[in-house]
Amino acid sequence: MSRAMALSQLLPDVALARDVQVSGLVMDSRAVRPGDAFVAIAGFGAHGLGFAAQALASGASAILFEPPAPADLPVPADAIAVPGLRARLGVLADHFHGAPSQAMRMIGVTGTNGKTSTVQLLAQALTLLGTPTGTIGTLGVGLYGAAVPTGFTTPLVLQTHAELAQLRDAGAQAVAMEVSSHALDQGRVDAVQFDVAVFTNLTRDHLDYHGDMAQYGAAKAKLFARAGLRAAVVNLDDAFGRTLFAALDPALHAIGVSSRAQAGATVQAQDLQLDHHGIQFTLHIGEAAHPVRSPLLGRFNVDNLLAVAGALHALDIAPAQIAEVLGRLQPIHGRMNRLGGAHGAPLVVVDYAHTPDALEQALTSLRSHAQDRLICVFGCGGERDTGKRPQMAAIAEVTADVAIVTDDNPRGEDGDVIVADILRGFARPDAAIVQRDRAAAIHQAISMAGADDIVLIAGKGHEPYQEVAGVRHAFDDAAVAAQALLPRTGLGVRV
């Protein structure tokens, strides 16, 4: 639904030389359409005023900037100085789009691992329960099952509110949203009214940005201190989660979840069993207890299901309904996706695990399902936290029977340097197989696997590309694995 608003209505406290109609708020000059207001603020590499002329040429009706302007950049004659503009962007976007987050039940999910799975599983559950639900996150934006990729885990603040408005206008009654630490630190969810906040876990990642774990955790905690929040769902099996839970505002409906009998947990999984069919457990919510049988693989998916159960409980869904819908949830693309496993072929699992903790969880979980060897194909992304490279190697060496080191997304970094960093983490580097060609590494792993082996292809999950030297080439781990399975099964299809 197209919107338009007088600039004087959007900025009633700012003196305007002339009033104009604004049809959108945009920070990217390349995305400006006629009638949009171009918001020019300082970015990581440049100031938006440097692109004001391009925005005007594309039909921008107004240029908004935060004073003082950089001395080396020209300011268009009609540009409007808005004091504190950056801090006001969320409120302005919320006002412009008619407060979309207040029209839907908003669930924000944060944590190092499990955000995408939890958001997708929660949206799937709510949809099955009859509530049209939108998603915003790594897999894109849209109503559940129809998300369009955007390239962001959490979009920039103007786009966040625009996408919430689109979901509202498309009929969404609820939104499950990934909220990254970057988003919380950079104000990308400013003025979004969350009803429920969910914490999955905190493990090493993004220290190239946050500096240390304390700052990383503090960024995550911001989601739980927001005005208007009604409920918090926290994983009490995580050490930081327990600290976070203890510090919650007493006015919040605090819901602790645990699969390890942590004290204070409202939602628990007990009597856990894992087999080649999936997982089963008894779901306890308060005094209620119901059996759950899920086709999902891996112990960490128990944690994801508990996060979903906690969020549904916060939304006043009955325990019996929660248990029933958990058993109907299907795997998420790129998250412990299963291929093969029949007709004499090994079980192949494609997963997004790209942090030390996620890799350890994936391997440990699959070890519980494995009848024979566990073969791991993994790499590390270029131009990202280098400290996790040897950590992931050590985990693969200890937890898997065979480790094949390959390229992930080298980006602009030398792949040989990345591999050398990884190999430093092996106690016996000579025991690791190095095959930098990712497709060849996947084929090698599957060809060497026996019928009772499990092959984990870790790191890229749902990504349909491999980024090398700044160029994204079409590449899909699951598609390559399916092709490699063909000689073993004649089918190469997912099961």
From Swiss-Prot:
Top-tier EC class: ligase
Keyword annotations: ATP-binding, Cell cycle, Cell division, Cell shape, Cell wall biogenesis/degradation, Cytoplasm, Ligase, Magnesium, Nucleotide-binding, Peptidoglycan synthesis
Binding site for meso-2,6-diaminopimelate: 384, 408-411, 459, 463
The keyword Ligase belongs to this UniProt entry's keyword annotation: yes
Enzyme Commission number, as recorded: 6.3.2.13
Pathway participation: Cell wall biogenesis; peptidoglycan biosynthesis
Gene Ontology terms: biological process: cell division; cell wall organization; peptidoglycan biosynthetic process; regulation of cell shape
Modified-residue entries (N6-carboxylysine), positions: 220
Reactions catalysed according to its record: UDP-N-acetyl-alpha-D-muramoyl-L-alanyl-D-glutamate + meso-2,6-diaminopimelate + ATP = UDP-N-acetyl-alpha-D-muramoyl-L-alanyl-gamma-D-glutamyl-meso-2,6-diaminopimelate + ADP + phosphate + H(+)
Location of the protein in the cell: Cytoplasm
Motif (Meso-diaminopimelate recognition motif): 408-411
UniProt binding sites for ATP: 111-117
Homology family: Belongs to the MurCDEF family. MurE subfamily.
Protein name: UDP-N-acetylmuramoyl-L-alanyl-D-glutamate--2,6-diaminopimelate ligase
Organism: Xanthomonas campestris pv. campestris (strain ATCC 33913 / DSM 3586 / NCPPB 528 / LMG 568 / P 25)
